[in-house]
Amino acid sequence: FNGYLIMTVLATGIIYPIVGHWAWSSSYLSKYEAVDQLLAITGTVKTTGWLSDLGFVDFAGSTIVHSVGGWIALAAVIILGPRIGKYSDANRGKFTGSSFPLAVLGTLILWFGWFGFNGGSNGAMDETVPLILINTFLAAAFGLLTGLTISYLKFKKPDPFYIILGPLAGLVAITAGCNSMTSVTSIFVGIIGAIIAITVNEILNKFEIDDVVGAVPVHLAAGVWGTLAVGLFSDLTILDTGLDRFSQIKIQLIGIFAIGAFTFISSYILLSLYNKFFPLRVSPVQE
């Protein structure tokens, strides 16, 4: 628990502010009079981040919020290792959540809250908000249907984990471009996001990387896809970056790689150092 608290402080105090400045500073800092006053006094503070200057777009945070959390989670689970017996032949398939009904309820609450998350990121109640809300719903709904379909194809029955994974991946994926895509495109983004998340979850299990809550498939993988989808499918006139389609895709990839590399490397180093002095994992007896 102490390790979790330390990482939370490091993430919110160091990692998130840095990547947030890289990509969002031109959108937010310029609105505050205090920043203008600081500029007038010092003349040295740069209000725009380098990714923002390049034209990187992540409307509500598929990468800046979700993938960052996913990269931190990946570093943590690699350092911690799998739970005892998780991948033994005797226990395969037996490590499940304690209450799937509560997990599904939590998913529905998240889904509802996402309307405020994406809609509120617009900063104003204007004609853009209905499109944002519709796209958010469609991506989640078709992510759910995709998870359900894959579950039936694989297990011949609905699997709660896939049903939870699908809509959450759709929500994460559409977050970056919910204001600049058509409704049909948002459906496609949600479907592909769910497929990617489920695939990544299987890959993690194959390599015995124990991600208990599916943070890496949902937040990292679907977040990367959603950010790339902005370059692939968003209306360039709405993005208003002055870039053509190919250039926008290139800048999105640069942003994904830069933020991912910085977040994973810094969090892995910080967690490894902390783990040397204060073990992140409980003792085998406690576990």
What function would you assign to each model-found segment?
Residues 1-287:
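Hydrophobic alpha-helical transmembrane bundles of multi-pass membrane proteins
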